[in-house]
A protein has these predicted regions:
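Hydrophobic core register within WD40 beta-propeller blades
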Residues: 45, 86-88, 130, 175, ...
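Beta-strand-rich domains and repeat architectures in extracellular enzymes and scaffolds
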Residues: 34-61, 304-316
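Conserved loop/turn at the beginning of each blade in beta-propeller domains
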Residues: 38, 79, 123, 168, ...
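A short beta-strand motif characteristic of beta-propeller blades
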Residues: 30-36, 72-77, 116-121, 161-166, ...
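Short coil/turn segments that connect the beta-strands within blades of beta-propeller domains
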Residues: 50-52, 91-93, 135-137, 180-182, ...
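Short loop/turn segments that connect beta-strands within beta-propeller blades
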Residues: 67-71, 109-113, 154-158, 198-202, ...
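Periplasmic c-type cytochrome electron-transfer domains
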Residues: 178, 192, 202, 216-244, ...
């Protein structure tokens, strides 16, 4: 009865809710989320040169201009179906946004008081971040699934061309122009990768990695000597017991400071203690990938954790402002970063922008469709600016998405589902949990992209119910309170929206007719896949099957039978097998001779890899 009353009161609250925005409060309505009226979901914001307006880019494909003094949206422009990132170049008065649905870089400018599209250029899929050069004549775009960065040269404000496209050993996420104005730091979107791109030479200068994953933001310290990162560290050898989670022993939320001089060196720096069981040296091209030494600042304490740190800025008087995305808070430190004051904001705060005088900060509340206006010192919320004129009732999948990114599901708020399954994919790390009903044999965190069609679940294939697996993960991995049936339904609804990742080949050739894979080799590889029996375990259409198999691998507890993971999007995985012991498809087939009754020749292995890289 209480639950029914709670639902009734919630519905009544929705009906009478009035918000301020582009329409008057009297016109405010409740609407079902649809293609015509979706939640805005702000993903990026910038402050204009005179400090009077905010430019806010939203996942629903719109860019909004917000008047700061009146705290209202004064213009909304439809750019595409979905945007992922945006950056303002103040001197050029140009706003570059990324159309992640159609894979374009779009240039906007204010003309006669209105935002106007000036140019757009195709980029590899899936563009997720960009930076401008200091002079505003170039942009660098990170394309996630293509595992590439693309240097774009602007020809005035109405056209552009691609100057160079560079491949990476990881899926790129965040970018930042370094103080020398020549080099750009490139962060891994999921795992522990870092790179430095030399904009003058149009090539990679450095390949490195950190002890961590989920690099959510990059910033430069006030003295311009340190690159700051918000990220997480998953301790693969710590079982997810209640005490371990409570004391922060399973997953840590941190700000890491990397000395820029070390980052820009030739890579001869000393190695730090590496949390990964797969070693700390890798080779990409002719570059050795070393762990970059950094100073780690831990966020959160038992009973009051700081799950999923995101946006980050540092002021000239040495105050650090960090967005605690998973617990809906912003933390503002004292001078010298000795302690933080936390203030509550909207749901899933992500991006942050600082006013020129550093007295105000503006924060995107992604799931509240709003901007929080903060006073830096003393720390407090001054106002909340709504981005939509009506309250849109979330769908089941949208409620599930909110739960997926909510660190409060875990004990003390240490981590969310997203913390390990980054944006529904994987952080490429190992975790020792009770998914397989035992501790002592850490397993690779699987991607959840396409997961609704790959039953059974867990590495040993012991779960046939996605609802039960979700409930078990929250209670025994996250050590949170039990999730009810409605919450399980909502999370399942969200997981059903997650499609398998695009292959690297498809992402790189999205706008190009040039084949990145030999079609003859692909046909030959498909034939080998079928004739060699790979298809027996990795059956079409999802390239998996319901059984578990002994393929000559054994975990630490003696288990030898494992359920085969789907091979859809396998090119987007940094490590393979249940424990990540293989670092590439070539290693799987050549060194481990996986699934081969008869040894394949080098030519056959290459053809099979070409096929697998395409699916």
């Amino acid at each position: 009865v209480r639950q029914k009353l709670a639902i009734l009161y919630t519905l009544i609250a929705f009906i009478f809710l009035m918000t301020r925005g582009e329409t008057s409060a009297a016109d405010s309505t409740v609407a079902k989320s649809s293609a015509a009226e979706k939640r805005a979901v702000p993903v990026a914001l910038d402050i204009t040169n005179n400090g009077t307006q905010l430019l806010v880019s939203c996942r629903n494909g719109t860019v909004k201009r917000v008047q700061i003094d009146s705290r209202e949206v004064i213009e909304t422009v439809n750019v595409s179906q979905q945007l992922s990132a945006a950056k303002l170049h103040i001197a050029q008065r140009a706003y570059a946004v990324l159309d992640t649905e159609n894979n374009f870089l779009v240039r906007l400018e204010v003309v006669d008081g209105k935002l106007k599209q000036m140019a757009k250029i195709a980029v590899p899929a899936k563009p997720v971040d960009l930076v401008w050069s200091q002079d505003g004549k170039r942009c660098l775009v990170a394309s996630n699934w293509a595992r590439q960065i693309t240097a774009i040269q602007w020809n005035g404000n109405s056209s552009a061309k691609s100057a160079a496209t560079v491949e990476l050993p990881f899926a790129p996420g965040k970018l930042i122009l370094l103080p020398d104005q020549r080099n750009v730091a490139v962060a891994d979107a999921f795992g522990n990768g870092m790179a430095v791109f030399d904009w003058q030479e149009l090539k990679l200068k450095r390949i490195a990695k950190i002890d961590g994953h989920n690099i959510s933001d990059l910033a430069i310290s006030f003295d311009k000597k340190t690159l700051l990162l918000t990220h997480q560290v998953l301790y693969y050898d710590k079982g997810t017991t209640r005490p371990a989670v409570h004391w922060g022993g399973v997953l840590a939320n941190v700000v890491e400071g990397i000395d820029l001089e070390s980052l820009l060196s030739d890579g001869n720096n000393s190695l730090t203690g590496n949390n990964s069981p797969t070693g700390n040296k890798e080779i990409f091209g002719n570059k050795e990938r070393l762990t970059v030494p950094g100073k780690v600042y831990f966020l959160g304490i038992p009973d009051e954790a700081a799950g999923d740190p995101a946006g980050l800025v540092e002021t000239s008087d040495e105050r650090r402002i960090v967005v605690y995305s998973g617990v809906n808070q912003v933390a503002i430190s004292d001078r010298g970063v000795n302690f933080y004051n936390r203030i509550g904001v909207g749901k899933r705060p992500t991006k942050i922008a600082l006013s020129a005088n550093e007295e105000r900060a503006y924060v995107c509340n992604s799931f509240s469709d709003s901007i929080s206006v903060l006073q830096v010192n003393p720390a407090k919320v001054l106002a909340t600016i709504p981005l939509t004129g009506q309250t849109v009732e979330p769908t089941a999948s949208e409620r599930g998405e909110e739960l997926f990114f909510n660190s409060k599901l875990a004990q003390d708020g240490w981590f969310s589902c997203h913390s390990c399954h980054t944006n529904g994919h994987t952080n490429h790390q190992l975790n020792d949990n009770l998914g397989d009903d035992s501790f002592g044999a850490p397993k690779r965190v699987p991607s959840l992209l396409g997961v609704s069609k790959t039953a059974p679940w867990t590495w040993r294939g012991t779960s046939n119910s996605l609802h039960q697996q979700i409930a078990k993960s929250v209670e025994l991995t996250m050590r949170g309170k039990p999730v009810d049936k409605l919450q399980q339904d909502d999370i399942v609804a969200y997981l059903k929206t997650l499609l398998p990742p695009m292959s690297v080949h498809a992402a790189r050739s999205f706008h190009s007719r040039r084949a990145t894979i030999d079609p003859v080799a692909v046909r030959k590889g498909r034939s080998i896949f079928r004739k060699s029996g790979c298809v027996d375990c990795h059956s079409l259409p999802n390239y998996t099957s319901a059984d578990s198999y002994d393929v000559g691998l054994k975990d630490e507890l003696g288990n030898t039978k494992f359920n085969p993971p789907s091979l859809l999007g396998v090119s987007q995985r940094d490590n393979l097998f249940h424990d990540g012991r293989a670092g590439s498809l070539k290693e799987v087939l050549k060194e481990f001779r996986h699934g081969q009754d008869r040894e394949l020749s080098d030519e056959q292995i290459e053809a099979l890899i070409q096929f697998l890289m395409r699916i």
